[in-house]
Amino acid sequence: MSTNFGPDLRSWVATLQSADQLCRVAVPVDWDEEIGAITRANLSLGGPGLLFENILGHEKTRCTKFLTSAIGNRRQIQLMLGLPEGTGDSAIVRHLKAAFRNPVPPRVVESGPVTQNIVEGDDIDLFQFPAPKWHANDGGRYIDTFCGVVTEDKVTGRDNVGLYRGQIVDRDKIAKLMVPSQGWGGHFEEYKPDPMPVAIVYGWHDVLPFCAGSPFARDVCEWDMMGALLGQPVDLIACETVPLHVPATAEIVVEGYLDPDPATFALEGPFAEYPGFLGSAAPAPVVRVTRITHRDDPVLRGTLEGIRPGFFNEDSITNFARSAITWNMLEDLGINGITAVWMTEVSNGQDTVVQIHKAYRGHAQQVAAALWGTGGSVWFHKNVIVVEEDIDIHDPVALDWAMTYRVNAGLGDIAFYGPTMGSPLDPSTPPEKNDAAKYGAGEWTRVLFDATRSWEFEPRPEWGGRHFPPIDKVDPALEARIAARWEEYGIGIPYLDDERRELLTMEQLSRRLKDV
């Protein structure tokens, strides 16, 4: 595969390979469940990207290769962002937060290798591409799992690049899960009663699915954010059969129209979705394919859904971007004192932890109310935990401690809000309330856990005039003497690193937070 066209899937594969983060699987594998099971085990082990090059039934089809697990671990995220190995989770989020503040708009070019091969008319056949049947109970082969679905807002002319699942239901048809409260769901309404033009991008640089699966505000174009991460514009070319633009160096592009007429719908699903449970089947709108373009020797990109303890996936890794976007949104809404945000991986962002410099009573409640009012909250922020700066939001033990000793339900530290819109894929909601076609979304009752120190207590002399009992910590001078004599004690293990020494004394934190 040539890699001389700038940022694209091939340059990304080369980056992974040079960092020992790619495995080329040359032995025969089956698209029917085997790829899914291999991927599940590999992701659980934090393994490399997998490039399957010998897929049964696809030895001589238009596309013979399939890539997955290419942003499935932290090292791959560091590589994608140009960060050193060992960069911590908090630093990754901060890097993304800053990058998303500096959008780089795309530029339109005349041509690109994605049009090296053009497929039209009776030659269109989606089964020429090795889309897996990922799980035993899936309704069919899911080609749209880690792609970029491009639509345009008829009013503003702004592109939306989203990540929406799709199942092959015929040679030229893809049934799509449609949630009206999503970005492209709004576009779908604008085009009614006419079909909506759609372009689906399979395989470009992995900033594409990373951004397409992230909850940017409606006035933000994902192309701009991809450019921000790459440090250069995304080169786009015009499609021929739909009025849209796609990356000039994409591997595969499907053009078509999504019809709102229920008479054209097809059964989509079931599908084992991101919560780790099997979703249900339902009639869904269908993309009728009008044209396919692809590079020579193209590579299809896809990913495995289904998160549960011990089994994260590429979608959960996207929570780095989601956390950064949410942090920026809170700041844009005028919420002061936000010092960190983390949308947990196993919850796929349904649990959101926010660290604050608490400045007033009700600060945590303000944070939760702001989160619940954002457009992306249909999928995220079901449960919100707010903590202070002495709690490491990436440490589940620290969060457990804060939840145990700073939350008192009888004092209003737990608050419920709802029913509200929520994810239609959450199995904790009764199925009759998860009908996205009827309601536009599912239904949640949301919860805030205020795990900050209560300001309801009066300052007490024995607490040093604080509102809350002080944390037991070691005097810095004493700790320094212990560190100096550690080897002398003969304990036989290395002394604490700088991070844990600060945790022991809280010397730096005490200078900023009087309540510590």
Locate each region found by the language model.
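Extended, highly charged
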Residues: M1-V286, T290-V516
